Structures are given as C-alpha cells and as structure tokens.
C-alpha cells in the first residue's frame, strides 16, 4: 500500500470490515412508528454503534411494493416466511476485532433489556453474524465496501444462496467471479456486490429474544447488492443473475429481498409496510 491511496484499488486500503451483523426485524402491527423511533433513536446506537470496533451501521426498509418483489416464495432465510421482515439493519465490524466486538455486544444486549430498553413488540426474522469474504465492483474507481453504509445507497438487495454439491462460500465466490458476477455487474444498477459467509456458532447464541431464521449450513453465503437507484430497478438483473448462478451449477437462491433507505429522523414508510 502506498499513499496517497490509489484510485480503484480498495482491496489495498488499510481499513476493512471483517465481519457483519445483519438483523431483519418485523414490528408488530400497530407499533410501526414506536418501533422505528425506538430503534433509530436508541437501539441503533445503544445496541451497536457505541461499541468499540463497530465501524459503521445503516438501516433500510421494505415497503409493501418491495416485499412483493421478493423471490423465491419458499425459503429458510426468513422466519416465518419470505414475506416477513420490514426493517433491516447492517453493521460493519473492523477486521481482526470480531471477538472483542462480540463480547461487548453480547453483554450489552442483556444490559439493555434488564434496564428496560428493549422493545418486545417486534419479531426477529433473520439476525445473524457473517464473515466478510470480498467485494466486487461495477466501476473502475468504486466506492469501497468499507464506505458502503456511510454512502447512504438508496437501495440494498440481500441475496442468500446455498452452494451446490456442498461447496464452501469461498469456493462458490471464486466460481461466481469467473463469469456470473462480472456479467451481472456490467451495465447494471448494482455498484457493489459484497459477499459474506455466515458465522456458524458451536452452540446457539444466548439472546433475550428469538433471533428468527438460523444462519444456514456451511455452504450458505449472503450477498449484499448496493445501488443508488430505486432497488426495484435492479430486480431484473438479479433475477437473471440468480438463474445464471443455478444454471452454472454454482448455487441455488434461497431468498432475494430488496430494501430502500430509511429517511433518518422521520417516520416515512411506517404506513406502507403492509
């Protein structure tokens, strides 16, 4: 690495996310505004952003029209079903410091709940931890993945895949990079495709609430697609991508779910979830 940092070479930059917390949640009907305000004005910070080595965090929302675009309908990546989960929050953890972050956050969530700062009128749909594998980019001089959450992309589409023939996530990514990923990114609205492998705990994580769908098996991987356009505009390209990935014998899609950016400090979209 040399200074100044060279354009178009984010892999050489000194700061990287090493792991991620992804939490997809459904507020109970009638509590949409209350949940949004509690999460944005308390839990987003108290539960994660205050923690050491928590690099960045951001939230998106799935309105009814975006939920209607999810596919396929049969999935184990959302509990109880593909249609569940309106708000998603994502946090980057600094590379090399996952264990310290996890020790802090695990204790923190119990402290918050015991202190009356929980929110029982919500259900977790998919809350899991992931290890960062790598990011692929559409542009020659891209926004590096480390900045993706601070960039406030208008859309984020989450895709959960299962590698075929028991392929591990890193092996699946290597195959995707040979053809499917470059073809999808070229000329599409997607600027960044970040690939993650679930962290499979030896024992179930302790939590004061049910965390929804599990992390999947050892061949599961998750891709976050970032776009600065309406996320709906990316769906045709991502449908073609999912079909190409399966046809190539690389992986099968468990769920593709698009989200739009929340408008911080407002209750916008809370009346459009159902």
Features from the language model and the residues they span:
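Macromolecular interaction modules
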Residues: 1-274
């Amino acid at each position: 690495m040399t200074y100044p940092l060279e354009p178009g070479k984010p892999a050489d930059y000194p700061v990287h996310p090493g792991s991620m917390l992804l939490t997809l949640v459904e507020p109970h009907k009638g509590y949409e505004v209350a949940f949004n305000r509690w999460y944005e004005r308390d839990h987003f910070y108290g539960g994660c952003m205050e923690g050491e080595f928590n690099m960045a965090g951001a939230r998106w929302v799935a309105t009814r029209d975006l939920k209607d675009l999810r596919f396929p309908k049969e999935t184990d990546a959302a509990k109880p079903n593909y249609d569940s989960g309106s708000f998603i929050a994502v946090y980057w953890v600094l590379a090399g410091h996952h264990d310290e972050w996890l020790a802090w956050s695990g204790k923190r969530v119990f402290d918050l709940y015991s202190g009356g700062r929980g929110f029982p009128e919500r259900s977790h749909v998919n809350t899991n931890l992931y290890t960062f594998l790598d990011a692929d980019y559409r542009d020659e001089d891209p926004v590096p993945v480390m900045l993706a959450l601070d960039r406030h992309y208008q859309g984020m589409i989450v895709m959960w895949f299962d590698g075929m023939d028991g392929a591990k996530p890193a092996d699946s990514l290597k195959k995707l990079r040979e053809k499917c990923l470059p073809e999808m990114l070229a000329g599409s609205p997607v600027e960044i495709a970040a690939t993650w492998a679930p962290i499979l705990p030896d024992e179930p994580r302790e939590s004061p609430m049910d965390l929804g769908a599990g992390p999947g098996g050892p061949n599961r991987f998750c891709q976050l697609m970032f776009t600065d356009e309406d996320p709906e505009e990316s769906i045709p390209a991502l449908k073609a991508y999912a079909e190409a990935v399966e046809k190539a014998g690389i992986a099968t899609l468990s769920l593709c779910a698009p989200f739009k950016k929340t408008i911080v400090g407002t209750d916008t979209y809370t009346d459009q979830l159902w």
